Structures are given as C-alpha cells and as structure tokens.
Design a protein with these regions (language model features):
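A short glycine-rich beta-alpha junction/loop motif
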Residues: 12-15, 109-115, 148-174, 300-303, ...
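Amphipathic alpha-helical segments
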Residues: 24-28, 167-202, 222-234, 346-385
Length: 400
C-alpha cells in the first residue's frame, strides 16, 4: 500500500537553502545591491514636494504630517525620487519594528529625507519586488543586522551597506511578472472593498445627520413615509434607567465568569458582578471620552467609564451618535465627560414609538452591513498576505 501511495504522489519540487529562505532550486538569490541602483540625486535649489513615510500608509506630504515645510541646507540634501523608485524608512514602529519600504506610485517626483535608503530596481521586475518588500520578506534579515537600540533621531542602527547586503529571491523573469500580476489583482480587489466600506461609513454619517433634527429644529430633514409632526425635546435621564460612573473594585483576570468593562471595551474578567442590564458606555477621561460602545449582561464597570443603563437603548444610542457627546467633554488637559453632565442633557425624540423603532432598525441594519464588509475586507487582506507568502517564496508556483 505504501508503495502505491508513493508511486501516485507527484515528485516534490527540488528546493535549496539560502541565507534568506528555502527556495525552488531553479530560483536564484542575490544581494539587494546587485538588482538595485542607489539614488543619490539631491534636491539642491529646486522646489519639489517633500514627503515622508508613514508606517502602514506609505508616502505622505511632509508638511501635512509635521505641520511645517522644510527649507535651507537640510532641504537641499533631500533625495529626489521619481515615479517607481523605492525608499526604506529606518524608523521603527509597532507594526514595522524593522522599518518599512514603499514605492512612489502616485507622484511623478518627490523629495525624501536623505536618512532614508532610496533606490530603484534596475534588474528584475519592480512590481515583484514591491510585493516582496510589502510582504515583510526582509524583516528577519534586517532584525539580525540591526544593532540593538534606536538612535537619538528615532532611526534604527542600520548601515546602508548592511541593508543592501540583504538577500532576495530572483525567480525567472516571466514568473516574477506573473506573481506580481496576481498580487496586484489582489490589491485592486482590496482597494475596491475599502472604497465600498468607506462609502457605507459615509452613508451612515450622512443619515445620522439627516434623520435627526438639526440644532434648533424639531423635525429631521429625512423621514420614513407615514410619519409627520414635530419631535419632542426630552431629558436623557428621563428616557433611561440610570446614568452613572463605574464603581467596581477588581483585579482583572484573563478568564472568568463575568466581563469587566473599561473605557472602550472588555478589559478582563472576574468571578462576581456589580451591574446587570443593557448599557451604553464611554471613557470618562482621555482621548476616548465621548466614544460610545454597547454591551449587555452581568458585568463589572471600571471607574474610568461612564455608563447609561436602560431598556430599548437602540434609539438612544443612535440619537447620541448624532448628538456626539464628545461635545460635552471639557478641561484644559485631557477631555473629560461627566455623568452629571449627561443627566442634564436634552435629546430630540419622535412622539411615535414606531418612528423610533424604524430609525433604530434602519441604522442597526446599516451597522450590520458595515460589519460584514469590514469582515470581508479583513478576510481578503489575510488571503492576500497568505498567498503572497506562498508565491513570493515559490512554495506555490505559477506558470510564467
């Protein structure tokens, strides 16, 4: 039986070990320096847009990022990139601890700091190597070459010669082109899904504005058919059970029977609870003060969390999103939202409970649709990431 199985199995492709990764035997490897040309062209006296690299985003206008334009000797030493050129930002970040490499795709030319390693691919398919860099292929090698620690300017201790000594795969050119084509198609699909998600989020924002009365008005701009008449102004505290600040005492555990609610989400677990019901919650102090989230059940609530408890909170939730309780935050330091302020807050409500239900149902369905699109987008990104790893290292081969 074993012989039959082995006979039926196709021969495994031959592999060879490199300093970078295990690759198909017909793929070559080479130092980055052998396929790229370092860029040394400086700005000098020319006026060229200055850009920087933002981890996870790519190239961004430097004035927009830092709030100022550069001039003088420092600017003159900036490196000129042309469309299709690459830059490696040696600044470390949480998502890119070994720095990140991006390609200039949406500008004809631009100037980048001369502390970046800037280069263009002169041998091989630039699209293939863009995908290789985006996949983080160099990270393991960079980690081994970086002198531990970060310099005073926030850059990693990595010399240019060490960066360019990193080994990269060099598949047959036709295969490079086919791999790049497949992964670029994935990027296009991701871009379309991101656009659709942005459109849905913008739709939600617009309808929150139009389906609730504007300040000083008692009817919304848009209503469902069959509903007329003015909305009423009511005290928020009169429409809910209670508004308060969490007072639970606890030592968070990684597991337990009951959830502990913090300023933005669940922060741990405990074996006892202090509160039970349906809640709207927000941070009491800090950058998240005024950002609402929902939760139901038996819970503990931290002292940095303001909560609203009640029944049928759907309409209240969307009414408060329209109102934007961040406007209630105050203080010269960090933003602060007080339960006492919320208790005195007025909100506009339809007299007809059916209209409240119709509005709540509409937004609940829209939020559900946004969640589905968000999940689909993340799944597509994961699929592309996995596919890139398989294709870029030859684990899965494609016809050139």
């Amino acid at each position: 039986m074993a012989n039959m199985i082995y006979t039926a199995m196709p021969a495994l492709p031959k592999k060879h070990h490199t300093n970078a990764v295990v690759l198909p035997s017909e793929w070559n490897t080479c130092p980055l320096s052998s396929i790229v040309e370092e860029i040394s062209e400086t700005v000098g006296t020319r006026k060229i847009e200055t850009i920087s690299i933002s981890a996870g985003i790519g190239f961004v206008n430097q004035a927009e990022k830092f709030g100022r334009e550069l001039s003088g000797k420092q600017y003159e030493k900036y490196i000129v990139l042309h469309k299709g050129d690459f830059s490696y930002n040696k600044g470390n970040s949480n998502i890119y601890p070994q720095g990140c490499i991006y390609r200039l795709n949406n500008r004809t030319e631009a100037a980048v700091p001369n502390v970046f390693e800037s280069f263009r691919v002169s041998v091989g398919n630039p699209d293939y190597y863009e995908q290789l860099f985006l996949s983080g292929f160099l990270n393991r090698q960079l980690y081994s070459k970086i002198n531990r620690g970060v310099r005073d300017n926030g850059l990693l201790n990595l010399k240019g010669k060490d960066f360019y000594s990193c080994e990269v795969p060099y598949p047959p050119l036709a295969e490079q082109e086919r791999i790049a084509e497949i992964l670029i198609q994935c990027d296009h699909v991701i871009e379309l899904k991101e656009q659709k998600l942005d459109e849905l989020k913008q739709l939600k924002k617009e309808f929150l504005r139009k389906m609730f009365p504007a300040k000083g008005c008692d009817t919304p701009e848009i209503r469902f058919p069959g509903f007329t008449g003015a909305w009423e102004q009511r005290k928020l505290i009169d429409e809910v059970t209670s508004i308060d600040t969490g007072k639970s005492k606890f030592t968070p555990q990684k597991s337990g029977v009951y959830e502990i609610l913090g300023s933005t989400s669940v922060i741990g677990y405990d074996d006892s609870y202090d509160y039970e019901g349906d809640f709207l919650l927000t941070a009491r102090v800090g950058a998240n003060a005024g950002e609402l989230y929902r939760h139901s059940g038996k819970v503990k609530i931290s002292d940095n969390t303001v909560f609203i408890k009640g029944e049928q909170l759907d309409f209240i939730y969307y009414a408060l999103l329209h109102f934007d309780i961040k406007r209630l935050s105050f203080g010269t330091g960090q933003p602060l939202v007080k339960a006492s302020e919320l208790k005195t807050q007025d909100i506009m409500m339809p007299v007809d409970s059916d209209e409240r239900s119709a509005i709540s149902t509409y937004f609940s369905n829209l939020v559900h649709l946004i969640t589905l699109h968000q999940r689909e987008l993340e799944e597509t990104k994961t699929y592309k990431k996995t596919l890139a790893k398989l294709l870029l290292t030859g684990i899965v081969r494609v016809q050139g």
